[in-house]
Amino acid sequence: MDMEGLGARIKSQSAMEYLMTYGWAILAIAIVMVSLYSIGIFNLGNLKPTATPGSCQVVRTATQTSLAGQCNNLIPKYVGQFGGTSYIKTGTVGLPLGNNQRSISMWVYPKSANNGAFYTYGTYASQEMVGLLITSAGSSLYFQVYGTDWDTGMSLNLNSWNFVAVAYNPTGNTVTAYVNGNTQTHSLGSALNTALPGSDPSDVGKIMNGQGQYAIGYIANIQVYNASLDNTTIKAIYKEGIGGAPIAVQYLVAWWPLNGNANDYSGNNNQGNATNMVWNANWQSGYTQPTS
């Protein structure tokens, strides 16, 4: 009797029986793992150390402005969760007024295309405010000034993280908008005349000055600058990802990471006062670290 041949047949039969018994389970696990990877879970690009609240901040002295703390290669432990009645009233020190240059960037995870406001400041009057919203028509990024508003037409992905930014230059009254690395530029036709009201001048999660239009979803890492940042700088902010520190700190006037609190870490003390806020630690689904 060919014992070696018999042994080989037994091993082959055992292997086939094993595959028939467990093959479908292995296939199902593989499909689940691929699905989780596609939505950001188990994506090795997202597995970075988490930043504790306030781990990085801007320090201002008489001679310089600089970053201090753990500021590199981190993602936030928390993000701000806005449920339709949530908002944060903020300080206004240094916010660009009149027709001056300005730039605003942030990460947003809209759950509804409901005309909700991500961040706004100013007075609810013609050309006297600035803000970023999501439209109900097309889920696009909307630059509101309560006058010559601009629907950028650049759609935001619902139930997913998006980087959004605008840079305003009074030369030609031009606005450059950014969504996930894509860019468009537009002339408003009229100059801004941003002015602060006596109450409720600056809000995250709704329109300021006693108005509504509440955001529904998550918001993180709001940065406000008193300069019209160029494409290279804003794209560098985007590539840093959701936990990125400000880059052009000499122009920074407000920085709300929303990592577990509403504090301003720009050094300007524009602290936020939060209402109905949840600080969510389970935010990574739908986020992928930018690579280009």
Each model region followed by its residue ranges:
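N-terminal leader/signal peptides at the extreme start of proteins
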Residues: M1-S14
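C-terminal juxtamembrane segment of a hydrophobic transmembrane alpha-helix
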Residues: M16-Y18, Y22-A51, D230
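Extracytoplasmic low-complexity segments
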Residues: T52-S86, L97, T171, Q184-H186, ...
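Extracellular glycan-recognition modules
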Residues: S86-Y142, L158, G172-Y178, N209-Y214, ...
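Short hydrophobic/aromatic patches on beta-strands that form ligand-binding or substrate-lining surfaces
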Residues: I104-S112, V164-V166, V204, I219-Y225, ...
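Short, aromatic/His-centered strand-loop micro-motif at the edge of beta-sheets
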Residues: L141-F163
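Extracellular glycan-interaction patches encoded by glycine-rich segments
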Residues: Y146-D151, P197-A220, E240-I242
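Short, solvent-exposed beta-strand-to-loop segments that form ligand-recognition rims
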Residues: V179-S202
